[in-house]
C-alpha cells in the first residue's frame, strides 16, 4: 500500500469521524432546542399563572377594602347576585338535559373547563350579556368576600334607597377592574346587556338620594 492510498484512507476515516461528530452535535442541538422550547412553555405558563394569581389577589384585596354602609353593600350585592343567578338560569335553559349536573353556577364554572358543550354555551351567554370572564371573576369574588353580610334588595327597594347606582360605584369603588365589572352588572340587570365602555353619568348628591317626599 503506497503513501497516497494510506493518506486517502486516513483522510476518509478522518472525514467519517468529523461526520459522526457533526451528527452528534446536530442531535445535541435538537435536544437543546427541544429542552429550550419546553422551558419557554413552562416559563410562559408559570408567568401567566403568577399574573393570574396576582390579579386575583389584587381583586380580593380591592373587594375587602371597600368601605360601604350596610345599605350600599346590600345594593351592590343585589345586582351581583341577580347577574350570577341570571347567568346560571340561562345556562340551564340552553342545556336542559344537564340541569341535575349543574345545580349551581360554581358547577357550571367547573364543568366548562373540560366540557366543550358547556363551555360553548357559557361563552355565548357571556357574549349575549356583554360580559367577559374577568367580570365573572370580579363578581364571584365580591359575592364570596362580602355576600355573607349582605341581603338582597328587590329593584323597588333599591330605587327607594338610591336613584343612581352608577354614581355610587364610580365614587366608592377605586379598583378599575372591579368598578367596570360592577357597572356592567348593573347594565345587565337594568338594560339586559352590558356595554364594554359604559358612559359614566355625573349626578349631584341631590339626584343620588331621593327626598323623603318622593
Swiss-Prot record:
Native species: Homo sapiens
Coiled-coil portions: 6-42
Keywords: Coiled coil, Membrane, Transmembrane, Transmembrane helix
Segments traversing the membrane: 65-81
The UniProt record lists the keyword Lyase: no
Mode of membrane association: Single-pass membrane protein
One cellular-component annotation, GO: membrane
Matches recorded under InterPro entries: DUF4547
Subcellular location: Membrane
Name of this chain's protein: Single-pass membrane and coiled-coil domain-containing protein 1
Amino acid at each position: 500500500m503506497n503513501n497516497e492510498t494510506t493518506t486517502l484512507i486516513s483522510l476518509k476515516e478522518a472525514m467519517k469521524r468529523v461526520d459522526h461528530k457533526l451528527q452528534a452535535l446536530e442531535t445535541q442541538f435538537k435536544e437543546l432546542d427541544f429542552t429550550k422550547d419546553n422551558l419557554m412553555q413552562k416559563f410562559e405558563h408559570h408567568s401567566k399563572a403568577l399574573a393570574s394569581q396576582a390579579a386575583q389577589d389584587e381583586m380580593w384585596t380591592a373587594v375587602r377594602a371597600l368601605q360601604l354602609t350596610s345599605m350600599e353593600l346590600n345594593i351592590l350585592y343585589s345586582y351581583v347576585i341577580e347577574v350570577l343567578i341570571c347567568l346560571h338560569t340561562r345556562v340551564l335553559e340552553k342545556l336542559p338535559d344537564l340541569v341535575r349536573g349543574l345545580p349551581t353556577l360554581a358547577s357550571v364554572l367547573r364543568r366548562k373547563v373540560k366540557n366543550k358543550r358547556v363551555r360553548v354555551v357559557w361563552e355565548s351567554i357571556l357574549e349575549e350579556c356583554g360580559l367577559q370572564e374577568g367580570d365573572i371573576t370580579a363578581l364571584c369574588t365580591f359575592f364570596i368576600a362580602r355576600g355573607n353580610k349582605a341581603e338582597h334588595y328587590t329593584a323597588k327597594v333599591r330605587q327607594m334607597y338610591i336613584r343612581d347606582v352608577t354614581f355610587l360605584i364610580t365614587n366608592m369603588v377605586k379598583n378599575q377592574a372591579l368598578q367596570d365589572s360592577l357597572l356592567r352588572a348593573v347594565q345587565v340587570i337594568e338594560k339586559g346587556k352590558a356595554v364594554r365602555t359604559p358612559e359614566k353619568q355625573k349626578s349631584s348628591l341631590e339626584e343620588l338620594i331621593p327626598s323623603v317626599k318622593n
